[in-house]
Structures are given as C-alpha cells and as structure tokens.
Amino acid sequence: MDKSDLVQKAKLAEQAERYDDMAASMKAVTEGGVELSNEERNLLSVAYKNVVGARRSSWRVISSIEQKTEGNEKKQQMAREYREKIEAELQEICNDVLGLLEKYLIPNASQAESKVFYLKMKGDYYRYLSEVASGDSKRTTVENSQKAYQDAFEISKKEMQPTHPIRLGLALNFSVFYYEILNTPEQACSLAKTAFDEAIAELDTLNEDSYKDSTLIMQLLRDNLTLWTSENQGDEGDAGEGEN
C-alpha cells in the first residue's frame, strides 16, 4: 500500500476510533523512512497516544483492585496476572514507538520543531514504561525519560517561542514527570510556572493557527499548578494531572 493510501486508512481508522489500526498504518508510513509531514506526525502521535492510553488506564484500575484484594489470595493472584498481561501489552507498544523514534523519526527530523516533538515523545514513552517498571529497569527508564525531556527542553528554549504549543506541551509533560515520577513537586511547580508566565508575557506572539492549542495547554499548566500547590499544603486532592 502506498503512503497516501496508508495515511487515508489511518484517517478512516481515527474516525472509527480504531486506534490500533490507525497506529499500524502510521507505523508503516514511518517505516517508509521519509520524514513525516506535520499532519502525518500528528496522526502517528494521536494513534499511539490512544493505544497506550487505554492500557495505562486499564493498568491503573487493575493495580488498584489488586491492592484492595489483599487477604483474598485467589482474587489477588487473578488481578496480578491480569495486570501483568496489560503491562506486557503496554511495554510492547512503548517499545514499538521508541523503536520508530530511534530508527526513523529523530534521525530524520530536519526542523527544530520536529526534533522537540519527537524528543518529547521519547520522554513520554519512557515515562509510561517507568510507571510500570521496578528495580534497575525503573532506574533506566526514568533516566532515559529525563534525558529526552531535557534535550527537547534545551532546543525548545533556543528555537521556539514560549507560546508555541509544542514547547508548552513539553513543559507540561516534563513538569508531570518531575511531580509523578521523580516526586519533586518544587521542580514541577517551578517548571510549570515559568512556562506559563513566559507564555503570558508573550501572548502577542500567539500564532492564530495554534491559538486554541496554546491556550488549552496553558490552562492545563495552571490547573496542575493549582492542584499541586493545594496538595503540598496538605489538602487531599485527586492527582488528576493534565497531560499533553
């Protein structure tokens, strides 16, 4: 199937909310080895975000049930085995994406914007792996995630406006990484606040095309800041961090 057919198939799959099919089509496009257009890049990102998001959500539900069944060995074992099955699926998806990033997407990225987009994606998928990892594997995935985010962050500060939705989305997810994975709320809040304040200061540079995306991410940054600040003051809040 040629590239334009695969892209069309991915769009059909998105309309039908069949994200596994959408991801398979966009994986095939990526493996063609040609740099993706912005539209193709977004299709790939949306597909895998939904595919992995479903497993992350399932994993959280089953992990919670597993903890609640302490004392009932049979139920707990069933929950554990099911969690491990979901975990294996999640790991396979993340490794798929990371493979595409390493082999095709990052090496082929000619623009700073694409490089930041893909390095952020690398940070995200190592973060998802770290959520279900333990021991040495946890340490490695956390380090890889932080390095990818940091590399993306350096480029975004040099090459992109503070109001650019990709730069803002990176700040959002990197701050969630600090809060949830490294458990460093001060760093999380500082990063999110700086990104928000810098964007506010340059609101006049907001590109009309990306106005909606940028303001939505700014809202998520502010929501997270509010939540994290209240949690650190001892209020019990539900940690429903917004992510991009």
Swiss-Prot record:
Keywords: Acetylation, Cytoplasm. One of its GO terms (cellular component) is cytoplasm. The keyword Cytoplasm applies. It is found in: Cytoplasm. The record marks R56, R127 as: Interaction with phosphoserine on interacting protein. Its main location: cytoplasm. The modification N-acetylmethionine is found at M1. Belongs to the 14-3-3 family. Adapter protein implicated in the regulation of a large spectrum of both general and specialized signaling pathways. Binds to a large number of partners, usually by recognition of a phosphoserine or phosphothreonine motif. Binding generally results in the modulation of the activity of the binding partner. This is 14-3-3 protein beta/alpha-A. It comes from Danio rerio (Zebrafish).
